[in-house]
């Protein structure tokens, strides 16, 4: 029987097959698409693996009579002889049954039922004589034919895929003991924790698909399902909705629209199939793992338990896994997988740490000015045009190129002589993504305009000032403020705590007397007109006259102007409310001080961001403007997202394609190998040893200053800069380290040594070793040629950016 292609997540992939599956369609359908992973979909299915292992335990023979566990298969008589053998039946076709010990002594013949039909074949006898010798005589082999199975060829073939029932706890232990890709498993555990259980995850995905279907379906109905000519002709005085609906409007849609709707239907079908596979083979097994091994019986507890507690319980299971156990196989020289809080965060954040470093080291230059559209420059952040659309394209092009299918850094990227070839290939990826974005741009723009309209209209109707007065952090700020090894839920919590103090800091700066006075006048006039129209509508309303439909101007009724002036009044009132509240606070009995510098310092307690260029300038409007680029108005962020749908192809083609060489150089220079962990970002290891910093920054130091002009002060300054994740000296790495210890309660939990590190003496590595780390002392530098990961594409972009990040 051919092997099933839906392999387990713990089986290693074939490199050649993965390279062949790297097709154009696999790139189009995007991350985790069913097309991209159907041939190598990674499941947690211990039952099928146990069945195969039981067959191999019987000796691995495909011959039916060679299995000692099948004691009731046939009756053997040693009196007959023949050279013929029964047809060979593969072990995969044997039905799994519990083993029953024989009732007679081993080697004797069990009694033959009188009414049982006998089918005989000549085959060599393998019986055991009374003296213990193996009989080599040829015997007449008799096969007992069951009543339900008509023929010999189907006698021992299972009717369906046989599964061995495994108790829940043993199933979870089997899952944990047979992990091969630890990065993926830990990411699945964290995804389950952040998703708050299997039902919340599944329902969230269903809601996302339903939202996508509704937006496309409702837009199609409004475009081709309503007869607007009949409504505008006014030939009939009374019309209902049923009179305006066009029956079978899909058949009358343009051919291009039908093609797009057909592709959309296929995409939704694939997403549903993928959701089923994830629920059946991944989420269910992860839920069982949480319940049986992590002692979390209900998913509701995931909302109250901390991630640090889960990490602590996970570390207690390390001796049950052959990859992480250090108490067994003491003579095994193979590296063991490291498992503590720092290593778990490094595995989950392996890819994101590189993006954080790329942005904080200013390797990615995303500044983009539009000479012909200079009016948009105040709206766009010209220093860094990073939106969700561009961020998704960056991950698409970089992740699937730099990292392989196992989540490790591709060894080819770490070789100097491959630099030019890899830079050209990465540049080609950026240009291909630009072309695809340009082709899909018209459809994506329409989709996102409708999506934002449907989403924010209700919020605008309830609170019109919310879209103008509210602020949020931009995508560029999120990557700029994020620490190394900081998991998303820690980062979201930190940003949410900073929003209140950030608004307080911005509101302390004066808005300008001219703007405030004009807004006060507009608010008064709009409120007065709205009040008069509402009172007149209530006074003149009767059965014969309707003031709401009275046309104040041509084709514009009183209700229309009430909506317009009411909106203006609400927006201006919301903008003036901040100044009023600040004045009331100043006049209240409690002391209130206008101190922007102290307010910004309080904000930095949550953001951990205060560059050296802000020193002694915290009270200035210049610093306030730079901070507003990070903490921008919500309406500006939405406009940037819509404009980026058009600008992303040009940024990918002209900006990022020319920086592909710098990206390759950065990954090669700032990747360090850690024994038991693999290649990780240098800054994520929190290694503050001088020798490592000098080694990692050697090339940059040579470019900055020649050795003949170096002084001791220069060495100290450059050493301080090398500690940072950014060149402006804001101590990115040390802040990440301190916050990491704070997030995991204490130092012992975060950097708990493994049993191996407690037993072995601490030995110093040779100076300049790239593997030297505070958390690991015996590194073995080795290079593993792992299969290159599959590529993904941008077609999934139609539903990637409309949903907020989980938990935000």
Curated annotation (Swiss-Prot):
Compartment(s) of residence: Preautophagosomal structure membrane; Cytoplasmic vesicle membrane; Golgi apparatus membrane; Endoplasmic reticulum membrane
Keywords associated with the record: Autophagy, Cytoplasmic vesicle, Endoplasmic reticulum, Golgi apparatus, Lipid transport, Membrane, Phosphoprotein, Transmembrane, Transmembrane helix, Transport
Modification(s) after translation: Phosphorylated by ATG1. ATG1 phosphorylation is required for preautophagosome elongation.
TM region(s), chain numbering: 206-226, 259-279, 518-538, 558-578
Cross-referenced InterPro entries: Autophagy-rel_prot_9
Biased composition (Low complexity): 72-89
Residues in compartment: Cytoplasmic: 1-205, 280-433, 455-517, 579-633, 655-808
Topological region Lumenal: 227-258, 539-557
Intramembrane stretches: 434-454, 634-654
Region entry Disordered, spans: 51-116, 698-732, 748-771
Basic residues bias: start-end ranges: 700-711
Keyword set includes Iron: no
GO cellular component entries: autophagosome; cytoplasmic vesicle membrane; endoplasmic reticulum membrane; Golgi membrane; phagophore assembly site membrane
Reactions catalysed according to its record: a 1,2-diacyl-sn-glycero-3-phosphocholine(in) = a 1,2-diacyl-sn-glycero-3-phosphocholine(out); a 1,2-diacyl-sn-glycero-3-phospho-L-serine(in) = a 1,2-diacyl-sn-glycero-3-phospho-L-serine(out); a 1,2-diacyl-sn-glycero-3-phosphoethanolamine(in) = a 1,2-diacyl-sn-glycero-3-phosphoethanolamine(out); a 1,2-diacyl-sn-glycero-3-phospho-(1D-myo-inositol-3-phosphate)(in) = a 1,2-diacyl-sn-glycero-3-phospho-(1D-myo-inositol-3-phosphate)(out)
Topology in the lipid bilayer: Multi-pass membrane protein
GO biological process: one example: reticulophagy
Protein's UniProt keywords contain Chaperone: no
Function (record text): Phospholipid scramblase involved in autophagy and cytoplasm to vacuole transport (Cvt) vesicle formation. Cycles between the preautophagosomal structure/phagophore assembly site (PAS) and the cytoplasmic vesicle pool and supplies membrane for the growing autophagosome. Lipid scramblase activity plays a key role in preautophagosomal structure/phagophore assembly by distributing the phospholipids that arrive through ATG2 from the cytoplasmic to the luminal leaflet of the bilayer, thereby driving autophagosomal membrane expansion. Required for mitophagy.
Domain notes: Forms a homotrimer with a solvated central pore, which is connected laterally to the cytosol through the cavity within each protomer. Acts as a lipid scramblase that uses its central pore to function: the central pore opens laterally to accommodate lipid headgroups, thereby enabling lipid flipping and redistribution of lipids added to the outer leaflet of ATG9-containing vesicles, thereby enabling growth into autophagosomes.
UniProt family annotation: Belongs to the ATG9 family.
Complex and partners: Homotrimer; forms a homotrimer with a central pore that forms a path between the two membrane leaflets.
Name by which UniProt lists this protein: Autophagy-related protein 9
Organism: Meyerozyma guilliermondii (strain ATCC 6260 / CBS 566 / DSM 6381 / JCM 1539 / NBRC 10279 / NRRL Y-324)
């Amino acid at each position: 029987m051919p092997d099933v292609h839906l392999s387990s997540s713990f089986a290693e992939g074939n490199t050649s097959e993965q390279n062949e599956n790297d097709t154009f369609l696999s790139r189009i359908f995007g991350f985790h698409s069913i097309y991209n992973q159907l041939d190598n979909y990674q499941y947690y299915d211990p039952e099928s693996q146990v069945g195969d292992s039981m067959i191999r335990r019987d000796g691995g023979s495909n011959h039916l009579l060679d299995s000692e566990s099948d004691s009731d298969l046939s009756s053997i008589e040693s009196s007959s002889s023949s050279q013929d053998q029964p047809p060979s039946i593969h072990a995969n076709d044997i039905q799994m049954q519990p083993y029953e010990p024989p009732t007679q002594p081993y080697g004797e013949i069990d009694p033959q039922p009188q009414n049982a039909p006998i089918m005989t074949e000549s085959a060599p006898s393998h019986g055991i004589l009374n003296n213990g010798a193996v009989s080599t005589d040829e015997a007449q082999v008799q096969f007992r034919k069951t009543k339900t199975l008509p023929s010999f060829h189907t006698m021992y073939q299972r009717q369906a895929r046989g599964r061995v029932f495994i108790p829940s706890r043993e199933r979870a232990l089997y899952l944990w003991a047979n992990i091969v890709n630890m990065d993926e498993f830990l990411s699945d555990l964290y995804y389950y924790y952040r998703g708050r259980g299997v039902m919340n995850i599944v329902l969230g995905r269903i809601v996302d698909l339903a939202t996508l279907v509704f937006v496309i379906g409702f837009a199609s109905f409004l475009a081709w399902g309503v007869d607007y000519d009949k409504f505008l002709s006014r030939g009939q005085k009374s019309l209902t909705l049923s009179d305006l609906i066009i029956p079978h409007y899909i058949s009358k849609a343009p051919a291009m629209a039908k093609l797009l709707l057909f592709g959309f239907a296929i995409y939704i079908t694939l997403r549903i199939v993928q959701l089923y596979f994830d629920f059946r083979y991944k989420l269910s097994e992860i839920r069982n793992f949480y319940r049986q091994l992590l002692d979390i019986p209900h998913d509701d507890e995931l909302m109250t338990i901390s991630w640090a507690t889960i990490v602590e319980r996970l570390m207690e299971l390390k001796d049950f896994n052959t990859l992480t156990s250090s108490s067994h196989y003491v003579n095994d020289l193979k590296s063991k997988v490291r498992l503590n809080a720092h290593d778990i965060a490094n595995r989950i954040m392996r890819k994101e740490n590189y993006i954080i470093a790329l942005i904080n080291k200013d390797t990615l230059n995303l500044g983009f000015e539009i000479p012909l559209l200079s009016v948009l420059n105040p709206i766009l952040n010209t220093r860094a045009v990073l939106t969700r659309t561009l961020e998704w394209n960056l991950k698409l092009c970089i992740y699937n190129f730099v990292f392989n299918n196992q989540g490790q850094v591709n060894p080819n990227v770490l070789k100097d002589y491959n630099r030019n070839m890899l830079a050209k290939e990465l540049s080609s990826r950026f240009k291909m993504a630009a072309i695809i974005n340009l082709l899909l741009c018209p459809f994506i723009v329409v989709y996102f305009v409708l999506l934002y309209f449907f989403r924010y209209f209700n919020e605008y109707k309830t609170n019109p000032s919310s879209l103008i007065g509210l602020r949020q952090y931009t995508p560029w700020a999120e990557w700029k403020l994020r620490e190394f090894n900081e998991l998303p839920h820690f980062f979201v919590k930190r940003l949410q705590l900073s929003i209140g103090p950030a608004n307080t800091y911005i509101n302390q700066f004066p808005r300008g007397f001219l703007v405030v006075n004009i807004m006060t006048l507009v608010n008064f006039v709009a409120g007065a007109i709205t009040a008069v129209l509402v009172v007149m509508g209530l006074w003149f309303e009767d059965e014969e006259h309707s003031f709401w439909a009275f046309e104040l101007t041509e084709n514009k009724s009183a209700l229309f102007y009430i909506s317009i002036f009411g909106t203006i009044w609400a927006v201006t009132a919301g903008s003036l409310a901040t100044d009023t509240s600040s004045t009331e606070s100043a006049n209240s009995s409690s002391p209130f001080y206008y101190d922007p510098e102290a307010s910004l310092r309080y904000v930095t307690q949550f953001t951990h961001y205060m560059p050296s260029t802000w020193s002694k300038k915290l009270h200035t409007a210049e610093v306030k403007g730079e901070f507003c680029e990070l903490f921008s108005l919500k309406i500006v962020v939405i406009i940037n997202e819509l404009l980026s749908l058009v600008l992303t192809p040009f940024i990918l083609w002209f900006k990022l394609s020319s920086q592909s060489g710098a990206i390759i150089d950065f990954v090669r220079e700032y990747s360090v190998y850690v024994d038991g962990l693999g290649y990780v970002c240098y800054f994520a290891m929190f290694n503050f040893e001088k020798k490592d910093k000098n080694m990692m920054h050697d090339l940059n130091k040579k470019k900055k200053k020649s050795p003949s002009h170096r002084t001791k002060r220069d060495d100290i300054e450059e050493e301080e800069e090398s500690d940072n994740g950014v060149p402006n000296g804001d101590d990115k790495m040390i802040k990440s380290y301190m916050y990491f210890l704070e997030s995991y309660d204490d130092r012992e939990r975060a950097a708990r040594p493994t049993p191996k590190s407690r037993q072995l003496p601490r030995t110093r590595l040779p100076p300049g070793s790239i593997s030297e780390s505070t958390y690991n002392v015996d590194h073995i530098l080795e290079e593993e040629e792992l299969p290159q990961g599959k590529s993904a594409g941008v077609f999934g972009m139609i539903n990637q950016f409309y949903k907020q990040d989980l938990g935000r």
